[in-house]
Swiss-Prot record:
Its main location: membrane. Residues 335-355, 365-378 have a biased composition (Gly residues). It comes from Emericella nidulans (strain FGSC A4 / ATCC 38163 / CBS 112.46 / NRRL 194 / M139) (Aspergillus nidulans). Residues 227-246, 469-480, 491-515, 526-549 have a biased composition (Polar residues). The gene is palI. One of its GO terms (cellular component) is growing cell tip. This is pH-response regulator protein palI/RIM9. Residues 304-313 have a biased composition (Pro residues). The chain crosses the membrane at residues 10-30, 89-109, 122-142, 144-164.
Length: 549
């Protein structure tokens, strides 16, 4: 148990009370505690004892009792009458003891929290100690006046109690002063925030709160567009955001926009997908198509004879064409050689079947010749950069095919070859091309005629027609034979499908088709072209008007 400020006060008050209590219980209550002794007589607060005989307990001395003690006025400092009057004041001893007892109880209660921190409580104790001290002091003075010069130790203990009460008063005053000072300091601290450090702590807390406080993120401003119409099937639309969608024209934008403007405007238009390109258009030294101005005036087919029907319109589709199939047969990519379109080969493999009469294989790029193909109509070209010629018994005229006719759906499996066509209502000469939209046709020049024997082919050492291209993966040899060497009128092979490949048979034999076959060219061109077979002494590159490179 820790000592508290009220503990010393309690101890002092206890001692003072004991001393005052001893003075109260003196003779005749306790014969061993006399206030004064003279001539074998012991004096106390409530009587005296003489030769062992004590008087009854009462307050004060009478004249008879004083005379019976045998004392005279010369024995004490006061006369007998004064002593008799003062003897009644001895009652202050029990009063002083009682007051001291009350102060002792209050000091003991000051150990509690509420009384010890109450200035008013300590003030009440201090006020009560003051009369206690005065009563104790009065008791000591009475003893001095009555019993001097025969005062005994019982009278002196009252003096000790009085001194202790004075000390208790000082301690009580100090306790209260300490408590009041503490409360006053707290009050001043409460009134002055800078003195108490409250402002400092407030600033620290505010700074910490500012650091810990998360700053709100400003929402990103977005441009909103309210939808004009909303369908009942869709949910509620709060905002619609603008998106950049690619139009269908983006797929038709040319990749190379730095080509010759004249060639783009008047000629080939940089091969924009969907533009019709003549099937047998002349090309320059590097395999690129010439502008229309360079070849529109020239005949499209360089074979002698009267002008034939005009070329078919690009909008007219082949009667057997399928939009789900790949690009037209032998339609090679533009450039100098390179790989063919994806889709595999025709029924006869990469070399296809025999040619029809007077059909030619126009070059689509630099490199070797694709060679004839076995089987029916030739499929897409092999990796070499050339497209094969239409096989014997092919269907429809050679015409310019637009890429939009096939929908860019990629090559599909080859469909069955259609059967013979019904005879037209007004049959014309054999070999007359069917024209849905007649167009004017220019008269071919005689200088463009090239003998069939002068047309050379690229033939390897084993008499097999192969493409010769730096990027081709299917070239066997690097042997070169002039391209139009075997284009003379020869007997065609039979049109029977799936015949085994016979390299020793003639390559350009005309097939004996039935009466329902319609040739792509007029017989006039065929007859005139056959007359020039024997002139094989002049190379094809030196023939005037020849555009094949």
């Amino acid at each position: 148990m820790l000592l508290k400020p009220a503990t010393p006060l309690t101890i002092l008050l206890l001692i003072a009370f004991v001393l005052l209590l001893l003075s109260v219980i003196s003779t005749p209550i306790v014969k061993s505690i006399p206030l004064a002794t003279f001539d074998n007589v012991e004096y106390g607060v409530f009587g005296y004892c003489k030769a062992g005989t004590c008087t009854a307990i009462h307050i004060g001395y009478t004249t008879e009792e004083i005379e019976n003690t045998g004392s005279t006025d010369s024995d004490f400092n006061l006369p007998s009458d004064a002593r008799r009057s003062l003897s009644s004041i001895l009652i202050v001893h029990p009063i002083a003891a009682f007051l001291t007892l009350i102060c002792l109880c209050l000091a003991a209660a000051a150990h509690l929290h509420a009384p010890s921190h109450s200035p008013r409580y300590l003030l009440a104790l201090l006020i009560l100690l003051l009369p206690t001290l005065l009563v104790s002091l009065l008791a000591f003075l009475v003893d001095i006046l009555l019993f001097v010069p025969h005062l005994s130790w019982g009278g002196w203990i009252v003096l000790a109690a009085t001194i202790i009460l004075v000390t208790c008063g000082v301690v009580t005053c100090a306790m209260r002063r300490t408590l009041v000072s503490r409360k006053a300091r707290k009050r001043r601290i409460a009134e002055n925030a800078e003195m108490s450090g409250q402002n400092y702590y407030n600033r620290q807390n505010a700074a910490a709160a500012a650091l810990n406080e998360s700053k709100p993120i400003a929402p990103e401003a977005k441009e909103t567009f309210v939808a004009a119409t909303q369908s009942s099937e869709s949910g509620p639309t709060f905002a619609t955001f603008r998106t950049n969608t690619r139009s269908s024209d983006d797929d038709r934008t040319p990749l190379n926009n730095h080509s010759d403007p004249s060639a783009q405007d008047a000629g080939y238009q940089s091969r924009i997908p969907g533009d019709p390109v003549p099937y047998n258009a002349p090309r320059d030294d590097f395999g690129n198509p010439l502008p229309p101005g360079a070849y529109n005036s020239a005949p499209r087919m360089r074979t002698p004879g009267p002008p034939g029907p005009p070329p078919p319109d690009s909008r007219v589709r082949d009667q057997y064409s399928d939009p789900r199939r790949g690009p037209p047969t032998g339609f090679a990519p533009r450039g100098r050689g390179g790989y063919p379109p994806r889709g595999g080969y025709g029924r006869g493999g990469p070399y296809g079947g025999p040619y029809g009469p007077n059909s030619r294989a126009p070059l689509t790029g630099r490199g070797g010749y694709m060679g004839p193909m076995r089987g029916g109509p030739a499929g897409p070209m092999a990796r070499g950069g050339y497209r094969p010629q239409p096989a014997a018994g092919g269907y429809g005229n050679a015409r310019a095919m637009g890429e939009d006719e096939y929908g860019y759906r990629g090559p599909s499996s080859r469909q069955r070859t259609p059967g013979p066509m019904a005879a037209p209502a007004a049959p014309g000469p054999a070999g007359q091309a069917i024209e849905m939209m007649p167009q004017p046709r220019h008269e071919p020049d005689a200088q463009d005629e090239v003998p069939e024997q002068q047309q050379l082919h690229a033939i390897s050492i084993d008499n097999q027609h192969e493409p010769v291209s730096p990027t081709s993966l299917y070239s066997r040899t690097q042997s070169y034979v002039p391209p139009r060497r075997n284009w003379g009128p020869q007997a065609y092979q039979s049109s029977e499908p799936n015949l085994p490949y016979q390299p020793n048979q003639p390559r350009h034999a005309r097939s004996q088709s039935g009466s329902m076959y319609y040739e792509d060219e007029d017989p006039v061109y065929t007859s005139r072209n056959e007359s020039a077979v024997g002139n094989s002494g002049v190379p094809s590159v030196l023939t005037p008007g020849n555009s094949a490179k």
